[in-house]
From Swiss-Prot:
Cellular location(s): Endoplasmic reticulum membrane; Mitochondrion membrane
Annotated pathway: Phospholipid metabolism; phosphatidylcholine biosynthesis
Record has Transcription regulation as a keyword: no
Enzyme class: transferase
EC number: 2.1.1.71
Membrane topology: Multi-pass membrane protein
Protein name: Phosphatidyl-N-methylethanolamine N-methyltransferase
Annotated keywords: Endoplasmic reticulum, Lipid biosynthesis, Lipid metabolism, Membrane, Methyltransferase, Mitochondrion, Phospholipid biosynthesis, Phospholipid metabolism, S-adenosyl-L-methionine, Transferase, Transmembrane, Transmembrane helix
């Protein structure tokens, strides 16, 4: 018996995992370079940011539901169903959730959902928990939640999809981190010129 199957629900899930960060990065770059979303929101950049936040949030929930549905259609590996693995899965989920929720709290709604691409820049780099223990707590916490769900359901396919989540987020960071640094460097340069 196979330990996982590449079926339609698995493939749909793999596509949804890849599309989430791709689409929000395309939308955010378009906003930064052309004010596309602000134009759609009648010139209100805060409203545009909230609209993107809602889209990202809903897309994340849809992706998570697709993931759970895909796992339900996969074979279960019995070794994952023992109490030790299930306990570890619960701990991983709790830690991942703490990373995600505490980073959302620290960043606020606008900071969490790409507000810097809309011109809403934080006064300084966020420090303190969870950013003092992890550079990317949202992405790493989310990845841990995927991992815990795979273990909880006892699905090897979930582990493979979790690996995809990990690599998709790493690729997204290759684009996001330098671009965000560029946005803040431009702001700092502008402020330095004003103070001269």
């Amino acid at each position: 018996m196979a330990i996982f199957e590449i079926n339609n629900s698995f493939l749909i899930c793999a596509v949804s995992i890849a599309l989430n960060p791709l689409l929000w990065n395309i939308a955010a770059r378009s906003e930064y370079n052309h004010k596309t979303l602000t134009k759609l929101a009648n010139g209100d950049s805060k409203k545009a940011c909230y609209m993107l936040a809602a889209c990202i949030f809903v897309a994340g929930i849809v992706r998570d539901l697709i993931y759970q549905n895909a796992l339900k259609q996969q074979p279960t590996l019995g070794i994952f169903m023992n109490p030790l693995v299930q306990g570890i899965a619960k701990l991983i989920f709790c830690f991942g959730s703490v990373l995600v929720l505490s980073s959302m709290y620290k960043l606020g709604l606008v900071g969490t959902y790409l507000g810097d691409y809309f011109g809403f820049l934080l006064p300084e780099r966020v420090s303190g928990f969870p950013f003092n223990v992890n550079d990317n707590p949202m992405y790493n916490g989310s990845t841990l939640c995927f991992l815990s769900t795979a273990l909880r359901y006892g699905k090897v396919a979930g582990l493979l999809l979790t690996l995809e989540v990990f690599f998709v987020y790493r690729i997204a960071l290759k684009f996001e981190e330098p671009f965000t640094a560029k946005i803040y460097a431009a702001r700092d340069s502008k402020q330095a010129k004003k103070s001269e």
